[in-house]
């Protein structure tokens, strides 16, 4: 799909029992970490198998390549980060709208989880898409201090935060740029 002038990719998994169904189903979006790929995340998380037993549609959006870095990730932070023309929050908002209109998805049961850089993206979605995402599950990802100071969700948010105490890459206590 095109978002902000960029061709964006995602993988979708519809359980066998929902392919021909007209039942309204939840949507679970899962975000890969930095240097990651949606296809790997789809294989790694086990959400495909879980969706078969729990009757939800799983979607794995693909981040973009950061200019100068050469690796994939999510541009998180205040709305649309200053990283060129990429606006991942807008992409996810448009993706949710497209999926809800094309598939039998309950717009009130859209959930988001993500690992590491994907967890940072989850906090951005909590700040800016609280009207579209029902609950949030960041794993080993934090919120930028600047974002915390400017985060004004539309409602109280259900969030489950999972983080290891021995994480040296993204310490749970945060750093000078993240809390």
Mark where each language-model region is:
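Residue-level signal for short, function-critical loop segments
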Residues: 16, 95, 116, 142, ...
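Protein kinase-like catalytic core scaffold
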Residues: 27, 158-160
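Conserved beta-strand->loop/alpha-helix structural units within folded catalytic cores of enzymes
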Residues: 31-33, 116, 162
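Primarily recognizes the serine-hydrolase "nucleophile elbow" in alpha/beta-hydrolase
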Residues: 100-157, 168
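Short beta-strand/loop motif that positions the catalytic acidic residue
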Residues: 161-163, 167
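Conserved alpha/beta-hydrolase "acid-adjacent" motif
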Residues: 169-173, 179
């Amino acid at each position: 799909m095109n978002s902000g002038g960029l061709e964006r990719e995602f993988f979708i998994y519809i359980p066998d029992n929902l392919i021909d169904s007209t039942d309204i189903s939840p949507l679970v979006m899962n975000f890969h970490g930095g240097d990651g790929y949606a296809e790997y995340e789809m294989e790694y998380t086990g959400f495909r198998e879980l969706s078969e037993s729990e009757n939800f549609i799983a979607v794995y959006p693909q981040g973009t390549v950061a200019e100068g870095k050469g690796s994939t990730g999510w541009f998180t932070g205040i709305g649309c980060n200053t990283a060129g023309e990429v606006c991942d929050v807008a992409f996810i908002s448009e993706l949710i709208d497209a999926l809800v209109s094309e598939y039998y998805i309950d717009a009130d049961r859209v959930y988001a989880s993500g690992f590491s850089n994907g967890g940072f993206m989850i906090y951005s979605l909590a700040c800016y898409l609280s009207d579209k995402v029902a609950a949030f599950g960041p794993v080993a990802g934090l919120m930028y201090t600047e974002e915390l100071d400017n985060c004004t969700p539309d409602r109280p948010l259900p969030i489950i935060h999972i983080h290891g105490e021995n994480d040296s890459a993204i310490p749970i206590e945060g750093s000078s740029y993240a809390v």
